[in-house]
Design a protein with these regions (language model features):
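Charge-rich, well-structured scaffold segments of protease-associated domains
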Residues: 1-91, 126, 156-282
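M16/MPP (pitrilysin/insulinase) zinc-metallopeptidase core fold and M16-derived inactive scaffolds
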Residues: 141-159, 171
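His/Glu-based metal-binding/catalytic segments typifying zinc-dependent metallopeptidases
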Residues: 61, 88-149
């Protein structure tokens, strides 16, 4: 585990992601530093790990999912043979934090060739609410695909980034924009990246771009239907969220209804909360 953790921290983008997380999130559980996590792992013993495992088996919620051709009676008999007792386990997968008008900023110099700029935005939407799919489409237009604004305008047309993308996590209300850049382009890249979001807020995108984005999302959903991990993940979300998680056909139908106005409303709810810059020096 320590070797894997150290390897992750040696990845410049992973390191920058974690530093932005520390600036953005209020909850300490989402702001764990490398040194804290490493010390916690070092402090674990065979006895403490075994005790934690027994506590988990006795008290935590356990969900079993089976996919494929199997005998339900045999599965039921096997599960009953485990001797699990009833438990009232509650799992919270949605994290919400209020927006703060105080912009958090961080910077570090590292001996790497490429600088990394990260922008963290607060999104008030939650998984399964009415803004869910408009936010997904908005992120696709912004930086989720090769035709997106960040890639086309910032990387290809302006030549300001080697790598650029955006990621949306509705379980934590967090939109991340990040780019690998030359350090002298920091201010220009930051301004232009933010301007791509401003364009979406103002509705400066074409119907062709909107349809391209929807088509990419449709394809992703269709591919997930043939992926066992995706099917189990969706079943787990249904188990936890109930009606908040629509079925496949429901997603497609709702996706078709997302229009320019819905995307503009979603984009206008997104506000800059944190900025992190890792300046590469050689």
């Amino acid at each position: 585990m320590l070797a894997s953790l150290a390897a992750d921290m040696d990845d410049s983008f992973y390191f920058a992601h974690k530093e932005l997380d520390k600036l953005f999130f209020h909850d300490e559980r989402l702001r764990l530093e490398y040194s804290d996590l490493r010390n916690r792992i070092l402090a674990e013993t065979p006895q403490s790990s075994y005790s934690c495992f027994q506590e988990f088996l006795a008290n935590d919620r356990i969900d079993f999912f089976f996919l494929g051709d199997f005998n339900e009676v045999e599965i039921q008999n096997v599960l009953e043979s485990f001797g699990f007792k009833g438990r009232e386990g509650d799992v919270t997968i949605q994290y919400c934090q209020p927006y703060s008008n105080i912009l958090q900023e961080g910077m570090v110099r590292k001996n790497v060739g490429q600088s990394i700029l990260e922008l963290g935005y607060h999104c008030p939407s939650e998984y399964g609410d009415e803004q869910h799919l408009p936010m997904i489409v908005m992120n696709g237009l912004l930086g989720g695909f090769a035709h997106s604004k960040l890639f086309t305008n910032v990387r290809e047309n302006a030549g300001l980034a080697y790598t650029i993308s955006s990621q949306l996590d509705l379980f934590s209300g967090f939109l991340r924009m990040y780019a690998g850049i030359d350090r002298e382009n920091r201010n220009q890249a930051r301004k232009m990246m933010n301007n791509q979001l401003l364009d979406l807020k103002k509705g400066y995108f074409t119907e062709l771009e909107l349809e391209q984005t929807k088509e990419m999302i449709r394809r992703s959903l269709l591919l997930s239907q043939d992926n066992q991990s995706s099917l189990i993940e969706r079943a787990y979300q249904n188990a936890l969220l109930g009606k908040s998680s629509a079925d496949f056909k429901g997603w497609i139908a709702k996706l078709e209804q997302v229009d320019k106005d819905a995307i503009c409303r979603a984009a206008n709810n997104v506000k800059l909360q944190a900025i992190y810059f890792m300046e590469g020096i050689e």
